[in-house]
């Protein structure tokens, strides 16, 4: 009778050990599956990082344009009166303009005009500067005589200008709430016989090869930016 009890206890012990081992194996498999599901896909993370970078860059450009509008709204000049532009006129000008980023701080409007000369007739080159110290911000706007020239200018994206790779994008029209009228240039060059104006925000060069369409009969100076 004692032998039977010992044999029974041994059988129960073996069954208990097998069940325990089975549970441990199940836990190991489950943990392995969970670890596998938590692995990060490098390609997916790279795409997410790139999208975030593009969103931040777009927001930065948007903020810079808003800041420029606010600064230029308080600009003043001597001897020249600005002609207010309607929203429709502003939008039409923007369709003929491009944004140029990563511009060398020592670059002049004339140098930018020469760099984009082959794209078509240029009406205006505007280099934005800090209001406080007058130093360039590192970006500019170029207004062409026709919106067809914008497509050619966009092909200049990532070209080298003064040893730096510039970024060229279509100019976005600012929101109606941010006024773009009554603005002036910090050094304006308008062909033969034109006077230069002074303000705190930007400098411009305007080609004298062709008259600006749509502004005959207006005052001698206008500021679309």
UniProtKB/Swiss-Prot annotation:
Coiled coil region boundaries: 14-74
Membrane spanning stretches: none
GO cellular component: cytoplasm; nucleus
This protein's UniProt keywords: Coiled coil, Cytoplasm, mRNA processing, Nucleus, RNA-binding
Domain RRM span(s) in chain numbering: 96-173
Main localization (coarse): nucleus
GO molecular function list: poly(A) binding; RNA binding
Superkingdom field: Eukaryota
Region (Disordered): 1-42
Domain notes: The RRM domain is essential for specific adenine bases recognition in the poly(A) tail but not sufficient for poly(A) binding.
Name of the molecule in the record: Polyadenylate-binding protein 2
Gene: Pabp2
